Amino acid sequence: MKENWVYRRGDLYLANLGVPVGSKQGGVRPVVVLQNDVGNYYAPTITIAPLTSKIEKKRKQPTHFFLRKAKGLAKPSMVLAEQLDTCDKICVIRYLGRVSKGQMRGIDEAVRIQLDYYIPEQSEKKRQGKCRKDGEEGDG
């Protein structure tokens, strides 16, 4: 049945992340799919971030994103973007729901901070004004 599922970026699933080691999240818990939909279709794995319902701890950590409500979550949860993981699709137990577009933007922001892909808004505005035209070479 899982082979017939269509995994989409922003979907929430219940997954078995295995035995936790040290501070790494494990066990059966909600996860949010971060991988692009092309990869979700073809790959036997999905890139995810685990969620926790222990929302009091390190709530202001920039790699955490608070989900007060999300379609399919029973209680408020925290996305732990510092614990990005690749999960085999056979570890996915069931579909829970989906985060909103606004929530996904917040999760993306936390992931960018975790991976140091963070572009401050000022720099991003400058970059948008200097878009290359089709056929132009970039500087890297």
Residue ranges and their predicted role:
Residues M1-G140:
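Conserved functional hotspots at enzyme active or ligand-binding sites that engage polyanionic ligands
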